[in-house]
Amino acid sequence: YSGPLMARNPVLLPLPQKYVRTNASFHPKEIAVSSEGKLRSILMEFLEELPVSVQPDSRYKIEVSLVDKLDGIPLNSEEAYQLSVSSRGITIRAVSEQGAYWAIQTLRQLTERQGKRYSIQGCEITDWPAFRIRGFMQDVGRSYISMEELKREIEVLSRYKMNVFHWHLTENQAWRLESKIFPMLNDSCNMSRMPGKYYTIEEAKELVRFCKEHNVLLIPEVDMPGHSAAFIRAFRHDMQSKEGMAILKLLMDEVCEVFEEVPYLHIGTDEVKFTNPKFVPEM
């Protein structure tokens, strides 16, 4: 296996901070797993992609453990991990489930597959993110994107250790998040592109859960006071007016309830002429 399958260096993206390739490779037909809880489930999902059976008494082992500290990590230590691959086994050490999850994504990239064969490149890796926030913004306000496609995007982002999915939900063209208190926002007549397309409250909560499963933080954005033509069509009030701000405060209460499991709500404030100096401080 080590010859034809490992003739070239694996492509690792992003490149780990410290990566030493060895001459070993890991390719047993059976393996024992040492891990618990959520991490075991993630690990089993990866192993199901390979032609390998899980046998508790196998002499080949893959072990994932959470530790209090990893040495030699200068920043963002909560997402750091150490990964060791030899001919006898694989060891992952991290201080958090998120760090261990990133290690498993690296393990995926180290794996070469050819028919019913596979081989994992031997190495010693110590890795941590250079940036605390590694984000991707998806604008669904202008163009609705199906839940299935959004989930595919999030899954791909997590494979490359992107940890923030910024969800731009409102635009001049449409207000894409369901509102129970102001249903006119979702009326087709108030959307200038892809009318009638929006995300239900349950779908929004579902996407938050999906992001969490993939160690990605979802940050919802309700853009204000610019990019708000859809709001104006629905209410006939500018967001910066007294009436508009009163409506927005009620809407923000509703939006915060929808996204109660996430720590941030983005309010935009870009590309607009401010006519009300109290708008941003109040909102």
Question: What do these predicted ranges mean?
Answer:
Residues 1-129:
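Acidic, contiguous N-terminal accessory segments
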Residues 39-42, 149, 203, 279:
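Residue-level preference for nonpolar/small residues embedded in alpha-helices
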